[in-house]
């Protein structure tokens, strides 16, 4: 694996996504529409919206990043781009890391759109530093990008990618403390929740936005998410 080849792969991915209107719509349009619906649904329940906002942000960032990455990587594979690259001097490591670096800027932009819309338009109350929120989301994004790449290997078309959504996201939503606090779950569910990346994203955002904690207070959540991301990349 070389830096030049890796950057060449990531640069091609960036240019391809920039010229794809559907991808841009998924990055910017879809999160805004969904968050608008959420804000409208809780328009008369501001206290509830303030409490659930961190969990919603983490969930939507994971969901939309996973979807964007999975669909984009699948297109590369089904169109034969990956096969053509593998017969060149570009190695598998260059491809995987290059794709990761290519998707990351758009995923970060998407997370910033979600956070900005939530804070500025929906006007939720928050106590912590928003830059700490972004740092945590970058760690969660790393998991979502690599998870999307991994799952796309098993899909033959874009419809099958969407079929993986309940399998991938539903357990995380139920076991990350969004619906029921983890402490109130049966012990076996608590044990399973340990391997759910969304748990650490939700926990970290709640610490920052609801309690005003800093990045040093959630460094454990960030480290665990980075570990998940590295494991999926390998």
Language-model features: where?
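Small-residue-enriched core segments of transmembrane alpha-helices in multipass membrane transport
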Residues: 53-62, 134-144, 166-174
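Hydrophobic alpha-helical transmembrane segments in multi-pass integral membrane proteins
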Residues: 176-181, 205-211
């Amino acid at each position: 694996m070389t830096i030049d080849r890796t950057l060449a792969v990531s640069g091609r991915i960036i240019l391809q996504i920039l010229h794809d209107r559907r991808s841009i719509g998924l990055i910017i349009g879809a999160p805004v529409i969904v968050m608008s619906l959420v804000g409208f649904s809780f328009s008369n329940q501001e206290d509830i919206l303030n409490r659930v906002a961190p969990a919603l942000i983490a969930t939507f960032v994971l969901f939309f990043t996973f979807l964007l990455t999975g669909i984009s990587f699948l297109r590369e594979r089904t169109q034969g781009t990956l096969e053509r690259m593998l017969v060149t001097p570009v190695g598998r490591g260059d491809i995987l890391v290059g794709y990761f670096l290519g998707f990351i800027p758009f995923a970060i932009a998407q997370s910033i759109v979600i956070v900005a819309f939530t804070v500025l338009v929906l006007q939720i109350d928050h106590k912590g530093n928003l830059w700490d929120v972004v740092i945590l989301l970058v760690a969660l994004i790393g998991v979502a990008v690599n998870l999307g790449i991994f799952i796309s290997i098993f899909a033959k078309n874009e419809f099958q990618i969407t079929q993986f959504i309940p399998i991938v996201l539903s357990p995380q939503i139920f076991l990350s403390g969004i619906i029921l606090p983890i402490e109130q779950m049966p012990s076996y569910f608590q044990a399973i929740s340990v391997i759910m990346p969304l748990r650490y994203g939700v926990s970290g955002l709640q610490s920052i936005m609801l309690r005003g904690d800093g990045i040093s207070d959630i460094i454990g959540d960030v480290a665990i998410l980075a570990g998940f991301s590295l494991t999926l990349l390998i």
